[in-house]
Amino acid sequence: MSVSTFNRCWSKVILETLTRHGVKHFCIAPGSRSTPLTLEANRLQEQRRALCHTHFDERGLGFFALGLAKSSQTPVAIIVTSGTAAANLYPAIIEARQTGDNLIVLTADRPDELIECGANQAILQQNMFAGYPVASVNLPRPSQDYIVSWLISTLDQACHQQAQQAGVIHINVPFAEPLYDADEDEIDVHPWLAPVQRWLNHNKPWADHQALQEEVVMHEHWDNWRTKRGVIVAGRLTQEQSMGITAWANTMGWVVLTDIQSGVEPSLPYADIWLANKTVREKLLQADLVIQLGYAFVSKRINQFLADFKGEYWIVDESAHRVDPYHHIHTRFTAKVHHWLRAHPPLRQKPWLLEPLALSKFCASFIEQQVGGNLNEASLAHHIERILPNNGILFLGNSLFVRLVDALGKLPEGYPVITNRGASGIDGLLATAAGVGMGSNQPVVAMIGDVSALYDLNSLALFKNVNQPTIIFLINNNGGAIFDMLPVESSVKSEFYRMPHHTEFSQAASMFDLKYARPYTWADLSSVLKQAYSRKEATVIEIKVGPMDGSNTYKRLIEQISYAVIGA
Protein backbone atom coordinates (compact mmCIF):
# COMPACT_ATOMS: atom_id res chain seq x y z
CA MET A 1 0.00 0.00 0.00
CA SER A 2 1.22 3.49 -0.85
CA VAL A 3 2.37 6.03 1.72
CA SER A 4 -0.42 8.40 0.71
CA THR A 5 -3.10 5.74 1.21
CA PHE A 6 -1.82 4.88 4.68
CA ASN A 7 -1.64 8.60 5.53
CA ARG A 8 -5.37 8.68 4.81
CA CYS A 9 -5.96 5.53 6.83
CA TRP A 10 -4.09 7.05 9.80
CA SER A 11 -6.10 10.28 9.45
CA LYS A 12 -9.36 8.35 9.28
CA VAL A 13 -8.66 6.80 12.67
CA ILE A 14 -7.74 10.17 14.19
CA LEU A 15 -10.93 11.86 13.03
CA GLU A 16 -13.11 8.84 13.87
CA THR A 17 -11.80 9.00 17.43
CA LEU A 18 -12.63 12.69 17.70
CA THR A 19 -16.18 12.28 16.40
CA ARG A 20 -16.82 9.72 19.17
CA HIS A 21 -16.11 12.53 21.64
CA GLY A 22 -18.65 14.94 20.21
CA VAL A 23 -16.75 16.67 17.40
CA LYS A 24 -19.24 17.69 14.71
CA HIS A 25 -17.38 20.66 13.22
CA PHE A 26 -14.03 20.74 11.43
CA CYS A 27 -12.56 24.18 10.69
CA ILE A 28 -10.04 23.91 7.87
CA ALA A 29 -7.44 26.28 6.43
CA PRO A 30 -5.84 25.60 3.03
CA GLY A 31 -2.54 23.75 2.95
CA SER A 32 -0.76 20.83 1.35
CA ARG A 33 0.75 18.96 4.29
CA SER A 34 -2.66 18.69 5.97
CA THR A 35 -4.23 17.05 2.89
CA PRO A 36 -4.81 13.60 4.49
CA LEU A 37 -6.71 15.18 7.38
CA THR A 38 -8.65 17.57 5.15
CA LEU A 39 -9.80 14.85 2.76
CA GLU A 40 -10.91 12.60 5.62
CA ALA A 41 -12.85 15.48 7.18
CA ASN A 42 -14.51 16.01 3.82
CA ARG A 43 -15.46 12.32 3.72
CA LEU A 44 -17.16 12.71 7.10
CA GLN A 45 -19.07 15.67 5.70
CA GLU A 46 -20.13 13.68 2.64
CA GLN A 47 -21.42 11.00 5.04
CA ARG A 48 -23.35 13.75 6.89
CA ARG A 49 -21.48 12.98 10.08
CA ALA A 50 -19.75 16.35 10.34
CA LEU A 51 -19.66 19.85 8.90
CA CYS A 52 -16.57 21.46 7.41
CA HIS A 53 -15.93 25.20 7.58
CA THR A 54 -13.12 26.96 5.74
CA HIS A 55 -11.22 30.23 6.01
CA PHE A 56 -8.05 31.48 4.37
CA ASP A 57 -6.58 33.00 7.54
CA GLU A 58 -5.57 30.65 10.36
CA ARG A 59 -5.78 33.30 13.06
CA GLY A 60 -9.37 34.09 12.13
CA LEU A 61 -10.13 30.38 11.69
CA GLY A 62 -9.01 29.68 15.25
CA PHE A 63 -11.33 32.31 16.65
CA PHE A 64 -14.17 31.17 14.39
CA ALA A 65 -13.75 27.69 15.88
CA LEU A 66 -13.75 29.23 19.34
CA GLY A 67 -17.09 30.92 18.64
CA LEU A 68 -18.47 27.63 17.33
CA ALA A 69 -17.37 25.87 20.51
CA LYS A 70 -18.94 28.56 22.69
CA SER A 71 -22.37 28.48 21.07
CA SER A 72 -22.60 24.76 20.26
CA GLN A 73 -21.14 23.66 23.61
CA THR A 74 -19.25 20.90 21.80
CA PRO A 75 -15.54 20.42 21.05
CA VAL A 76 -14.54 21.85 17.67
CA ALA A 77 -11.59 20.59 15.61
CA ILE A 78 -9.22 22.77 13.59
CA ILE A 79 -7.02 21.47 10.75
CA VAL A 80 -4.04 23.49 9.51
CA THR A 81 -0.86 22.84 7.59
CA SER A 82 2.69 23.09 8.93
CA GLY A 83 4.77 26.18 9.65
CA THR A 84 3.46 29.55 10.75
CA ALA A 85 -0.04 28.39 9.83
CA ALA A 86 0.03 26.52 13.13
CA ALA A 87 1.52 29.46 15.02
CA ASN A 88 -1.33 31.71 13.92
CA LEU A 89 -3.69 29.64 16.07
CA TYR A 90 -1.90 30.66 19.26
CA PRO A 91 -4.14 33.65 20.20
CA ALA A 92 -7.32 31.55 19.95
CA ILE A 93 -5.68 28.74 21.91
CA ILE A 94 -4.75 31.17 24.68
CA GLU A 95 -8.31 32.51 24.82
CA ALA A 96 -9.83 29.00 24.85
CA ARG A 97 -7.54 27.97 27.67
CA GLN A 98 -8.51 31.03 29.71
CA THR A 99 -12.25 30.54 29.19
CA GLY A 100 -12.41 26.73 29.24
CA ASP A 101 -13.74 26.27 25.71
CA ASN A 102 -12.97 22.99 23.96
CA LEU A 103 -10.84 23.15 20.82
CA ILE A 104 -8.94 20.26 19.23
CA VAL A 105 -6.07 21.60 17.15
CA LEU A 106 -4.65 19.30 14.47
CA THR A 107 -1.39 20.68 13.08
CA ALA A 108 0.08 18.81 10.13
CA ASP A 109 3.87 18.63 10.29
CA ARG A 110 6.93 17.62 8.32
CA PRO A 111 8.48 14.28 9.33
CA ASP A 112 11.48 14.28 11.68
CA GLU A 113 14.12 14.10 8.95
CA LEU A 114 12.96 17.49 7.60
CA ILE A 115 13.12 19.35 10.92
CA GLU A 116 16.04 21.70 11.70
CA CYS A 117 17.84 21.05 8.43
CA GLY A 118 16.71 23.94 6.26
CA ALA A 119 13.66 22.22 4.79
CA ASN A 120 10.86 24.49 3.62
CA GLN A 121 7.94 25.29 5.94
CA ALA A 122 9.36 23.11 8.70
CA ILE A 123 9.38 24.61 12.20
CA LEU A 124 9.51 23.20 15.73
CA GLN A 125 5.85 22.25 16.24
CA GLN A 126 6.00 19.65 18.98
CA ASN A 127 4.64 21.19 22.20
CA MET A 128 4.72 24.57 20.45
CA PHE A 129 1.79 25.86 22.53
CA ALA A 130 3.65 25.25 25.79
CA GLY A 131 1.35 24.83 28.80
CA TYR A 132 -1.82 26.16 27.19
CA PRO A 133 -3.30 22.81 26.02
CA VAL A 134 -4.79 20.45 28.58
CA ALA A 135 -3.23 17.66 26.50
CA SER A 136 -0.52 17.65 23.82
CA VAL A 137 -0.11 14.61 21.59
CA ASN A 138 2.99 14.41 19.39
CA LEU A 139 2.26 11.60 16.98
CA PRO A 140 4.93 9.78 14.98
CA ARG A 141 4.73 9.67 11.20
CA PRO A 142 2.05 7.18 10.10
CA SER A 143 3.45 3.66 10.29
CA GLN A 144 2.05 0.15 10.48
CA ASP A 145 4.63 -0.51 13.18
CA TYR A 146 2.13 1.07 15.59
CA ILE A 147 -0.98 -0.95 16.33
CA VAL A 148 -4.18 0.93 15.56
CA SER A 149 -5.51 0.52 19.10
CA TRP A 150 -2.50 2.48 20.41
CA LEU A 151 -3.40 5.45 18.21
CA ILE A 152 -7.06 5.33 19.22
CA SER A 153 -6.42 4.94 22.94
CA THR A 154 -3.82 7.73 22.95
CA LEU A 155 -6.26 10.19 21.42
CA ASP A 156 -9.16 8.85 23.49
CA GLN A 157 -7.22 9.59 26.67
CA ALA A 158 -6.51 13.16 25.51
CA CYS A 159 -10.23 13.67 24.85
CA HIS A 160 -11.03 12.29 28.30
CA GLN A 161 -8.59 14.78 29.82
CA GLN A 162 -10.40 17.55 27.96
CA ALA A 163 -13.74 16.33 29.31
CA GLN A 164 -12.33 16.53 32.84
CA GLN A 165 -10.56 19.87 32.42
CA ALA A 166 -12.02 21.92 29.59
CA GLY A 167 -9.60 23.57 27.20
CA VAL A 168 -7.46 22.76 24.17
CA ILE A 169 -5.96 19.54 22.82
CA HIS A 170 -3.01 19.91 20.47
CA ILE A 171 -2.37 16.95 18.16
CA ASN A 172 0.74 17.31 16.00
CA VAL A 173 0.55 14.99 12.99
CA PRO A 174 3.61 14.61 10.75
CA PHE A 175 3.07 13.24 7.24
CA ALA A 176 5.65 12.06 4.74
CA GLU A 177 5.09 12.52 1.02
CA PRO A 178 3.43 11.59 -1.27
CA LEU A 179 0.17 13.09 -0.07
CA TYR A 180 -2.13 12.93 -3.09
CA ASP A 181 -2.28 9.57 -4.85
CA ALA A 182 -4.28 7.60 -2.26
CA ASP A 183 -6.49 4.77 -3.47
CA GLU A 184 -9.90 5.66 -2.00
CA ASP A 185 -11.12 2.05 -2.24
CA GLU A 186 -8.26 0.76 -0.08
CA ILE A 187 -8.58 3.16 2.85
CA ASP A 188 -11.48 1.51 4.68
CA VAL A 189 -10.38 -2.10 4.07
CA HIS A 190 -6.73 -1.80 5.02
CA PRO A 191 -5.59 -4.84 7.08
CA TRP A 192 -4.19 -2.47 9.73
CA LEU A 193 -7.80 -1.57 10.61
CA ALA A 194 -9.00 -5.17 10.97
CA PRO A 195 -8.56 -5.37 14.79
CA VAL A 196 -10.88 -2.38 15.31
CA GLN A 197 -13.57 -3.05 12.72
CA ARG A 198 -16.16 -3.67 15.43
CA TRP A 199 -15.34 -0.28 16.98
CA LEU A 200 -15.49 1.42 13.57
CA ASN A 201 -18.97 -0.01 13.01
CA HIS A 202 -20.48 1.73 16.04
CA ASN A 203 -20.25 5.29 17.29
CA LYS A 204 -18.89 4.96 20.82
CA PRO A 205 -15.61 6.19 22.33
CA TRP A 206 -12.79 3.68 22.79
CA ALA A 207 -13.02 3.72 26.59
CA ASP A 208 -16.25 3.96 28.53
CA HIS A 209 -15.33 6.55 31.16
CA GLN A 210 -17.97 6.61 33.86
CA ALA A 211 -18.84 10.11 35.01
CA LEU A 212 -17.92 11.00 38.56
CA GLN A 213 -21.17 11.14 40.52
CA GLU A 214 -21.07 14.04 42.94
CA GLU A 215 -23.96 15.61 44.81
CA VAL A 216 -23.51 19.08 46.23
CA VAL A 217 -23.37 18.77 50.01
CA MET A 218 -24.73 21.59 52.13
CA HIS A 219 -22.06 23.51 54.04
CA GLU A 220 -22.03 22.15 57.58
CA HIS A 221 -22.61 25.60 59.06
CA TRP A 222 -25.11 26.85 56.48
CA ASP A 223 -27.89 27.27 59.04
CA ASN A 224 -25.64 29.79 60.78
CA TRP A 225 -24.18 31.53 57.71
CA ARG A 226 -27.54 32.11 56.07
CA THR A 227 -28.55 34.36 58.98
CA LYS A 228 -25.56 36.65 58.34
CA ARG A 229 -25.07 39.71 56.13
CA GLY A 230 -24.22 38.41 52.66
CA VAL A 231 -23.23 39.63 49.20
CA ILE A 232 -23.64 37.52 46.06
CA VAL A 233 -21.30 38.40 43.18
CA ALA A 234 -22.27 36.74 39.88
CA GLY A 235 -19.62 36.54 37.14
CA ARG A 236 -19.59 34.70 33.83
CA LEU A 237 -22.14 31.87 33.92
CA THR A 238 -23.93 29.62 31.46
CA GLN A 239 -27.58 30.32 30.78
CA GLU A 240 -28.56 27.22 32.74
CA GLN A 241 -26.67 28.35 35.83
CA SER A 242 -27.91 31.94 35.80
CA MET A 243 -31.53 31.16 36.56
CA GLY A 244 -32.91 31.69 40.05
CA ILE A 245 -29.95 33.55 41.59
CA THR A 246 -31.75 36.88 42.06
CA ALA A 247 -34.84 35.28 43.61
CA TRP A 248 -32.67 33.21 45.98
CA ALA A 249 -30.66 36.25 47.09
CA ASN A 250 -33.72 38.49 47.43
CA THR A 251 -35.32 35.92 49.71
CA MET A 252 -32.19 36.09 51.85
CA GLY A 253 -32.21 39.90 51.85
CA TRP A 254 -28.68 39.85 50.45
CA VAL A 255 -27.04 42.27 48.02
CA VAL A 256 -26.48 40.95 44.47
CA LEU A 257 -23.74 42.34 42.21
CA THR A 258 -24.04 41.08 38.64
CA ASP A 259 -21.66 41.05 35.70
CA ILE A 260 -23.08 41.56 32.21
CA GLN A 261 -21.79 38.06 31.31
CA SER A 262 -23.77 36.39 34.12
CA GLY A 263 -27.16 36.27 32.43
CA VAL A 264 -28.64 37.32 35.79
CA GLU A 265 -31.22 40.11 35.58
CA PRO A 266 -29.91 42.59 38.13
CA SER A 267 -32.08 43.67 41.05
CA LEU A 268 -29.43 46.35 41.71
CA PRO A 269 -28.37 47.45 38.21
CA TYR A 270 -25.51 49.83 37.38
CA ALA A 271 -23.29 48.42 40.14
CA ASP A 272 -20.13 49.52 38.34
CA ILE A 273 -21.37 53.10 38.70
CA TRP A 274 -22.89 53.13 42.19
CA LEU A 275 -19.98 51.19 43.72
CA ALA A 276 -17.94 54.32 43.03
CA ASN A 277 -19.79 55.83 46.00
CA LYS A 278 -17.37 55.51 48.90
CA THR A 279 -20.04 55.58 51.62
CA VAL A 280 -22.08 52.73 50.16
CA ARG A 281 -18.96 50.75 49.27
CA GLU A 282 -17.66 50.92 52.85
CA LYS A 283 -21.01 49.73 54.20
CA LEU A 284 -21.00 46.85 51.72
CA LEU A 285 -17.53 45.85 52.92
CA GLN A 286 -19.08 45.23 56.36
CA ALA A 287 -20.75 42.08 55.01
CA ASP A 288 -20.01 38.87 56.88
CA LEU A 289 -19.90 36.67 53.77
CA VAL A 290 -19.28 37.11 50.05
CA ILE A 291 -20.24 34.26 47.73
CA GLN A 292 -18.65 34.43 44.27
CA LEU A 293 -20.64 32.60 41.58
CA GLY A 294 -18.58 32.14 38.41
CA TYR A 295 -15.71 34.48 37.64
CA ALA A 296 -14.14 36.97 35.15
CA PHE A 297 -15.71 40.27 36.19
CA VAL A 298 -15.66 43.20 33.76
CA SER A 299 -16.38 45.93 36.31
CA LYS A 300 -13.39 47.70 37.83
CA ARG A 301 -15.48 48.69 40.87
CA ILE A 302 -16.66 45.13 41.51
CA ASN A 303 -13.09 43.91 41.22
CA GLN A 304 -11.95 46.58 43.69
CA PHE A 305 -14.69 45.52 46.11
CA LEU A 306 -13.59 41.89 45.90
CA ALA A 307 -9.94 42.85 46.38
CA ASP A 308 -10.76 44.89 49.50
CA PHE A 309 -13.15 42.42 51.15
CA LYS A 310 -11.53 40.66 54.12
CA GLY A 311 -14.38 38.57 55.51
CA GLU A 312 -15.60 35.01 54.90
CA TYR A 313 -15.31 34.18 51.19
CA TRP A 314 -16.92 31.31 49.28
CA ILE A 315 -16.52 30.42 45.61
CA VAL A 316 -18.94 28.34 43.55
CA ASP A 317 -17.72 27.35 40.08
CA GLU A 318 -18.00 24.15 38.09
CA SER A 319 -14.37 24.24 36.91
CA ALA A 320 -11.39 23.17 38.97
CA HIS A 321 -9.43 26.30 37.99
CA ARG A 322 -8.28 28.99 40.36
CA VAL A 323 -10.74 31.82 39.82
CA ASP A 324 -9.85 34.24 42.63
CA PRO A 325 -7.21 36.75 41.49
CA TYR A 326 -7.28 38.36 44.95
CA HIS A 327 -6.25 35.18 46.77
CA HIS A 328 -8.76 35.12 49.60
CA ILE A 329 -8.74 32.41 52.21
CA HIS A 330 -11.89 30.74 50.96
CA THR A 331 -14.25 27.78 50.87
CA ARG A 332 -14.47 26.29 47.39
CA PHE A 333 -17.48 24.45 45.97
CA THR A 334 -16.77 22.77 42.62
CA ALA A 335 -20.34 22.63 41.40
CA LYS A 336 -22.87 24.09 39.02
CA VAL A 337 -24.44 27.16 40.58
CA HIS A 338 -28.05 25.97 40.33
CA HIS A 339 -27.08 22.70 42.03
CA TRP A 340 -25.39 24.64 44.82
CA LEU A 341 -28.44 26.86 45.33
CA ARG A 342 -30.67 23.81 45.56
CA ALA A 343 -28.43 22.36 48.29
CA HIS A 344 -28.43 25.62 50.26
CA PRO A 345 -32.03 26.66 50.97
CA PRO A 346 -32.53 30.38 51.61
CA LEU A 347 -33.88 31.88 54.80
CA ARG A 348 -36.49 34.59 54.30
CA GLN A 349 -35.34 37.82 55.92
CA LYS A 350 -35.32 41.57 55.36
CA PRO A 351 -32.52 43.27 53.39
CA TRP A 352 -29.55 43.99 55.63
CA LEU A 353 -28.46 47.03 53.59
CA LEU A 354 -30.87 49.43 51.87
CA GLU A 355 -28.49 52.05 50.48
CA PRO A 356 -27.52 50.05 47.33
CA LEU A 357 -31.18 49.86 46.29
CA ALA A 358 -31.66 53.59 46.79
CA LEU A 359 -28.46 54.43 44.95
CA SER A 360 -29.25 52.02 42.11
CA LYS A 361 -32.63 53.71 41.62
CA PHE A 362 -30.98 57.12 41.66
CA CYS A 363 -28.45 55.90 39.06
CA ALA A 364 -31.24 54.78 36.75
CA SER A 365 -32.67 58.29 36.40
CA PHE A 366 -29.28 59.99 36.55
CA ILE A 367 -27.84 57.81 33.76
CA GLU A 368 -30.92 58.42 31.61
CA GLN A 369 -30.40 62.14 32.04
CA GLN A 370 -26.67 62.01 31.28
CA VAL A 371 -26.70 59.78 28.19
CA GLY A 372 -29.50 61.79 26.58
CA GLY A 373 -31.73 60.85 23.67
CA ASN A 374 -29.16 60.92 20.88
CA LEU A 375 -27.70 57.79 19.33
CA ASN A 376 -24.25 57.61 20.85
CA GLU A 377 -21.92 55.12 22.51
CA ALA A 378 -23.31 55.53 26.03
CA SER A 379 -26.98 55.54 24.99
CA LEU A 380 -26.46 52.43 22.85
CA ALA A 381 -24.98 50.64 25.87
CA HIS A 382 -27.69 51.92 28.22
CA HIS A 383 -30.57 50.93 25.93
CA ILE A 384 -29.02 47.78 24.52
CA GLU A 385 -32.17 45.75 25.24
CA ARG A 386 -33.97 47.85 22.58
CA ILE A 387 -31.89 46.42 19.77
CA LEU A 388 -31.91 42.74 20.75
CA PRO A 389 -34.26 40.11 19.30
CA ASN A 390 -36.20 37.99 21.80
CA ASN A 391 -34.50 34.74 20.83
CA GLY A 392 -31.03 36.04 20.01
CA ILE A 393 -27.46 35.89 21.28
CA LEU A 394 -25.42 38.96 22.18
CA PHE A 395 -21.69 38.90 21.47
CA LEU A 396 -19.77 41.71 23.17
CA GLY A 397 -16.30 42.68 22.04
CA ASN A 398 -13.62 44.00 24.35
CA SER A 399 -12.24 47.40 25.33
CA LEU A 400 -14.54 50.36 26.11
CA PHE A 401 -17.95 49.20 24.90
CA VAL A 402 -18.16 46.03 27.01
CA ARG A 403 -17.42 48.19 30.06
CA LEU A 404 -20.16 50.62 29.08
CA VAL A 405 -22.70 47.81 28.68
CA ASP A 406 -21.64 46.28 31.99
CA ALA A 407 -21.95 49.66 33.72
CA LEU A 408 -25.01 51.12 32.01
CA GLY A 409 -26.98 48.25 30.47
CA LYS A 410 -29.66 45.82 31.64
CA LEU A 411 -30.54 42.53 29.99
CA PRO A 412 -33.49 40.19 30.53
CA GLU A 413 -32.97 37.21 32.83
CA GLY A 414 -31.00 34.47 31.09
CA TYR A 415 -30.31 36.41 27.88
CA PRO A 416 -27.27 34.70 26.30
CA VAL A 417 -24.14 36.84 26.35
CA ILE A 418 -20.89 35.55 24.84
CA THR A 419 -17.53 37.26 25.21
CA ASN A 420 -13.81 36.67 24.80
CA ARG A 421 -12.94 37.81 28.31
CA GLY A 422 -10.28 35.19 29.00
CA ALA A 423 -7.26 37.11 27.77
CA SER A 424 -9.55 40.03 26.78
CA GLY A 425 -7.70 40.74 23.55
CA ILE A 426 -9.13 42.67 20.63
CA ASP A 427 -7.95 40.07 18.11
CA GLY A 428 -10.36 37.65 16.46
CA LEU A 429 -13.58 39.25 17.69
CA LEU A 430 -15.33 39.35 14.32
CA ALA A 431 -14.28 35.75 13.67
CA THR A 432 -15.55 34.62 17.07
CA ALA A 433 -18.90 36.30 16.46
CA ALA A 434 -19.18 34.53 13.09
CA GLY A 435 -18.49 31.21 14.79
CA VAL A 436 -21.09 31.92 17.46
CA GLY A 437 -23.67 32.40 14.73
CA MET A 438 -22.65 29.27 12.85
CA GLY A 439 -22.92 27.18 16.02
CA SER A 440 -26.46 28.29 16.82
CA ASN A 441 -29.77 28.66 15.06
CA GLN A 442 -30.41 32.04 16.63
CA PRO A 443 -30.02 35.62 15.47
CA VAL A 444 -26.71 37.11 16.59
CA VAL A 445 -25.97 40.71 17.54
CA ALA A 446 -22.24 41.49 17.73
CA MET A 447 -20.95 44.74 19.22
CA ILE A 448 -17.37 45.39 18.09
CA GLY A 449 -15.09 48.42 18.43
CA ASP A 450 -13.49 50.09 15.44
CA VAL A 451 -9.89 49.12 16.25
CA SER A 452 -10.99 45.53 16.93
CA ALA A 453 -12.71 45.47 13.54
CA LEU A 454 -9.64 46.81 11.74
CA TYR A 455 -7.51 44.21 13.50
CA ASP A 456 -9.72 41.37 12.25
CA LEU A 457 -11.09 42.88 9.06
CA ASN A 458 -10.65 39.87 6.79
CA SER A 459 -12.91 37.85 9.10
CA LEU A 460 -15.84 39.72 7.55
CA ALA A 461 -15.52 37.04 4.87
CA LEU A 462 -16.86 34.53 7.41
CA PHE A 463 -20.24 36.28 7.48
CA LYS A 464 -21.02 35.67 3.81
CA ASN A 465 -22.65 32.30 4.50
CA VAL A 466 -24.61 32.94 7.70
CA ASN A 467 -28.03 31.27 7.92
CA GLN A 468 -29.77 33.56 10.41
CA PRO A 469 -30.14 37.33 10.87
CA THR A 470 -26.74 38.61 11.98
CA ILE A 471 -26.11 42.20 13.02
CA ILE A 472 -22.52 43.45 13.26
CA PHE A 473 -22.40 46.76 15.12
CA LEU A 474 -19.12 48.59 14.57
CA ILE A 475 -18.78 51.33 17.19
CA ASN A 476 -16.44 53.80 15.50
CA ASN A 477 -14.92 56.34 17.89
CA ASN A 478 -11.83 56.80 15.71
CA GLY A 479 -9.31 54.87 17.76
CA GLY A 480 -8.71 53.24 21.11
CA ALA A 481 -11.08 55.28 23.28
CA ILE A 482 -10.48 52.98 26.25
CA PHE A 483 -7.12 54.69 26.64
CA ASP A 484 -8.86 57.97 27.42
CA MET A 485 -9.18 56.52 30.93
CA LEU A 486 -5.40 56.61 31.36
CA PRO A 487 -3.63 59.49 33.15
CA VAL A 488 -1.37 60.24 30.18
CA GLU A 489 -0.67 63.64 28.58
CA SER A 490 -3.15 64.19 25.74
CA SER A 491 -0.73 64.50 22.80
CA VAL A 492 1.18 61.39 23.88
CA LYS A 493 -2.11 59.58 24.45
CA SER A 494 -3.32 60.36 20.94
CA GLU A 495 -0.12 59.30 19.17
CA PHE A 496 0.83 56.22 21.15
CA TYR A 497 -2.44 54.93 22.65
CA ARG A 498 -5.57 56.08 20.81
CA MET A 499 -3.94 56.03 17.35
CA PRO A 500 -6.81 57.66 15.40
CA HIS A 501 -7.30 55.99 12.01
CA HIS A 502 -9.89 58.29 10.30
CA THR A 503 -11.49 55.28 8.63
CA GLU A 504 -15.06 54.19 8.01
CA PHE A 505 -16.28 50.71 7.11
CA SER A 506 -18.69 51.11 4.20
CA GLN A 507 -16.13 49.98 1.63
CA ALA A 508 -15.05 47.05 3.82
CA ALA A 509 -18.65 45.83 3.91
CA SER A 510 -18.89 46.28 0.14
CA MET A 511 -15.64 44.38 -0.38
CA PHE A 512 -17.11 41.34 1.37
CA ASP A 513 -20.57 41.80 -0.20
CA LEU A 514 -22.31 42.53 3.10
CA LYS A 515 -25.27 44.82 3.68
CA TYR A 516 -24.23 48.12 5.29
CA ALA A 517 -26.00 50.96 7.10
CA ARG A 518 -24.91 54.02 9.04
CA PRO A 519 -27.84 55.33 11.11
CA TYR A 520 -27.63 58.76 12.73
CA THR A 521 -30.65 58.61 15.06
CA TRP A 522 -32.56 56.01 17.07
CA ALA A 523 -35.36 56.24 14.51
CA ASP A 524 -32.87 55.49 11.72
CA LEU A 525 -31.52 52.55 13.70
CA SER A 526 -34.99 51.16 14.36
CA SER A 527 -35.74 51.19 10.63
CA VAL A 528 -32.40 49.56 9.77
CA LEU A 529 -32.89 46.82 12.37
CA LYS A 530 -36.40 46.03 11.16
CA GLN A 531 -35.00 45.28 7.72
CA ALA A 532 -31.92 43.49 9.04
CA TYR A 533 -33.91 41.10 11.23
CA SER A 534 -36.09 40.16 8.26
CA ARG A 535 -33.07 38.84 6.32
CA LYS A 536 -31.12 35.65 6.93
CA GLU A 537 -27.85 37.37 6.21
CA ALA A 538 -25.36 39.70 7.83
CA THR A 539 -25.74 43.46 8.11
CA VAL A 540 -22.91 45.78 9.14
CA ILE A 541 -24.21 48.76 11.13
CA GLU A 542 -21.62 51.45 11.74
CA ILE A 543 -22.25 53.85 14.61
CA LYS A 544 -19.91 56.83 14.30
CA VAL A 545 -19.46 58.69 17.57
CA GLY A 546 -17.22 61.39 18.95
CA PRO A 547 -13.75 60.17 19.93
CA MET A 548 -14.25 60.81 23.64
CA ASP A 549 -18.05 60.83 24.00
CA GLY A 550 -18.35 57.40 25.59
CA SER A 551 -15.31 57.63 27.83
CA ASN A 552 -16.21 61.14 29.00
CA THR A 553 -19.76 60.11 29.90
CA TYR A 554 -18.42 57.08 31.77
CA LYS A 555 -15.89 59.14 33.74
CA ARG A 556 -18.46 61.84 34.50
CA LEU A 557 -21.00 59.35 35.85
CA ILE A 558 -18.45 57.67 38.11
CA GLU A 559 -17.15 60.97 39.43
CA GLN A 560 -20.57 62.43 40.20
CA ILE A 561 -21.99 59.27 41.77
CA SER A 562 -18.91 58.94 43.97
CA TYR A 563 -19.95 62.13 45.81
CA ALA A 564 -23.70 61.52 45.87
CA VAL A 565 -25.43 61.48 49.26
CA ILE A 566 -28.33 59.05 49.19
CA GLY A 567 -30.65 58.29 52.07
CA ALA A 568 -31.68 54.70 52.51
UniProtKB/Swiss-Prot annotation:
Entry annotated with the keyword Metal-binding: yes
Disulfide-bonded cysteines: none
EC number assigned by the record: 2.2.1.9
Residues passing through the membrane, by range: none
Residue ranges that the Swiss-Prot or TrEMBL entry lists as coiled coil: none
GO MF annotation, one: 2-succinyl-5-enolpyruvyl-6-hydroxy-3-cyclohexene-1-carboxylic-acid synthase activity
Cofactor remark: Binds 1 thiamine pyrophosphate per subunit.
Keywords, alphabetical: Magnesium, Manganese, Menaquinone biosynthesis, Metal-binding, Thiamine pyrophosphate, Transferase
Record keyword DNA repair present: no
Cofactor: Mg(2+); Mn(2+); thiamine diphosphate
Catalyzed chemical reaction(s): isochorismate + 2-oxoglutarate + H(+) = 5-enolpyruvoyl-6-hydroxy-2-succinyl-cyclohex-3-ene-1-carboxylate + CO2
GO biological process: menaquinone biosynthetic process
UniProt pathway: Quinol/quinone metabolism; 1,4-dihydroxy-2-naphthoate biosynthesis; 1,4-dihydroxy-2-naphthoate from chorismate: step 2/7; Quinol/quinone metabolism; menaquinone biosynthesis
InterPro entries the UniProt entry points to: MenaQ_synth_MenD (IPR004433), MenD_middle (IPR032264), THDP-binding (IPR029061), Thiamin_PyroP_enz_TPP-bd_dom (IPR012001), TPP_enzyme_TPP-bd (IPR011766)
Family to which the UniProt record says this protein belongs: Belongs to the TPP enzyme family. MenD subfamily.
Stated role: Catalyzes the thiamine diphosphate-dependent decarboxylation of 2-oxoglutarate and the subsequent addition of the resulting succinic semialdehyde-thiamine pyrophosphate anion to isochorismate to yield 2-succinyl-5-enolpyruvyl-6-hydroxy-3-cyclohexene-1-carboxylate (SEPHCHC).
PANTHER family: 2-SUCCINYL-5-ENOLPYRUVYL-6-HYDROXY-3-CYCLOHEXENE-1-CARBOXYLATE SYNTHASE, PROTEIN PHYLLO, CHLOROPLASTIC
HAMAP family the record matches: MenD (MF_01659)
Complexes and interactors: Homodimer.
Protein name per its UniProtKB record: 2-succinyl-5-enolpyruvyl-6-hydroxy-3-cyclohexene-1-carboxylate synthase
Encoding gene (name): menD
